[in-house]
A protein has these predicted regions:
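Acidic, His- and aromatic-enriched active-site or binding-groove loops in soluble protein domains
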Residues: 16-20
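Conserved phosphate- and dinucleotide-binding cores of soluble alpha/beta proteins
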Residues: 9, 15, 27-32
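A conserved mid-domain beta-alpha-beta active-site/ligand-binding segment of alpha/beta enzyme cores
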Residues: 23
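Single conserved hydrophobic/aromatic residue that forms the stacking wall/gate
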Residues: 1-13
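Asparagine-biased alpha-helical interface segments
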Residues: 29-148
């Protein structure tokens, strides 16, 4: 199923629809009609499903924070990045990893961060991290270790 999703199978499309509609529909037309916080929570639920299926001890999470745009990486025509690269982050805890990346954006000296912060705040982006933490998927606390 994981391999099939990588090549754009019907199963992958159905699963994306369920995430975007908070499992309230199987119709593509309904993808962007769900309550936004419910959509963010469904992303955390999907993460939990993968973690439970694969096994938490078998996953390492990596975030490559480069060419940071205000748009989702799933957008076919994203806005040009306004913020420079802030690094590559890795952890066995997906919640602390995402929290570290969010904090890195806020703490950056890059003046281009303003647009990204506005987008994260106006879309309540931190809610996925909050929901994942509430599901017990990890901790929002972390120790940042810089390498190199």
């Amino acid at each position: 199923e994981i391999c099939a999703c990588l090549v754009g199978s019907e199963m992958c499309i159905r699963d994306r629809i369920w995430i975007h509609t908070s499992a309230s529909s199987e119709r593509f037309e309904d993808v962007f009609t769900a309550d936004h916080d419910s959509f963010l929570e469904s992303m955390a639920d999907a993460d939990k499903s993968v973690m439970d299926f694969v096994g938490r001890s078998r996953i390492v999470y990596i975030n490559v924070a480069n060419r940071l745009s205000v748009d989702c990486d799933c957008d076919a025509h994203p806005h040009d990045p306004e913020m420079g690269d802030i690094g590559i982050f890795a952890s066995t805890d997906p919640v602390s990893l995402d929290q570290a990346c969010v904090d890195a954006v806020y703490n950056s000296l890059d003046t281009g961060k303003a647009a990204l912060i506005e987008r994260m705040e106006s879309r309540h982006g931190i809610h996925t991290v909050e929901a994942a933490h509430a599901l017990g998927l990890g901790s929002r606390d972390y120790d940042l270790v810089k390498i190199g």
